[in-house]
From Swiss-Prot:
The keyword ATP-binding applies. It comes from Helicobacter pylori (strain ATCC 700392 / 26695) (Campylobacter pylori). It is found in: Cytoplasm. This is Glucokinase. The gene is glk. It catalyses: D-glucose + ATP = D-glucose 6-phosphate + ADP + H(+). CDD domains: ASKHA_NBD_GLK. Keywords: ATP-binding, Cytoplasm, Glycolysis, Kinase, Nucleotide-binding, Transferase. NCBIfam families: glk (TIGR00749), PRK00292.1-3 (NF001416).
Amino acid sequence: MPKTETYPRLLADIGGTNARFGLEVAPRQIECIEVLRCEDFESLSDAVRFYLSKCKESLKLHPIYGSFAVATPIMGDFVQMTNNHWTFSIETTRQCLTLKKLLVINDFVAQAYAISAMQENDLAQIGGIKCEINAPKAILGPGTGLGVSTLIQNSDGSLKVLPGEGGHVSFAPFDDLEILVWQYARSKFNHVSAERFLSGSGLVLIYEALSKRKGLEKVAKLSKAELTPQIISECALNGDYPICRLTLDTFCSMLGTLAADVALTLGARGGVYLCGGIIPRFIDYFKTSPFRARFETKGRMGAFLASIPVHVVLKKTPGLDGAGIALENYLLHDKI
């Protein structure tokens, strides 16, 4: 089949809260981007059909190839989302949507592929020096959950992405304050993972824990109705509530610890890349936050980490971009 006949391609980036859809009408050219709330649809197929109906006027040909990046492990045909109610069979969904091929990959596999094609203005560097070209790149990002993956560029230029579930590693507190936060979380959950703190709901959890700290019982606090990640972040940046600023500082410190742990584990001298929608919302603050200092506070490995650049991904739809690149690789090489 001529390459032009494989377009348009149906792309999706499905997280715990939102599902983003787009149509790739030519290489790296994505149109008709829509964001739908997962909770508004009973199933993935329902959401896709609704999306396609909205794009009907601009859809000259029905897509026959699709690539969906989903925020959950892919371990066969049956897929169960980690942070929302959707479950689906890949093959049944393919048939339902009358696709010739439906590729389903982990969302952070897509993020890794997207990073391979990013330009300098798509990224904001936070410290470090320069990436080593063929060294591993660590990709992680807080959102509804916490994703982690690895990108390796081989000497021949080919790419290898290693998916993982590093967001669910056990959280390791760094100091007495983080021990207090961990203890609060431990009273609520059997397993306290990094994702419990490094996510949207994690900001709320950190805030709740800090509000119980001795000496902070009587400080001005948000009402229960105001206790959302967005309001906590806004109040922290505006200086409205000191406890909100402490919450955001603690969040960034914890992220620095985890990013350093991942970088050390992988030897990620190709750089660390922070994806997801949370960090770009306060990028100016993040540049001077405790993140980088904590990232480099690893005793004998401090000098090793000091040279590793950390990049915040600023591009709006990297999940869709990566889903498209993964599908292109599959169609060309029969593998991703």
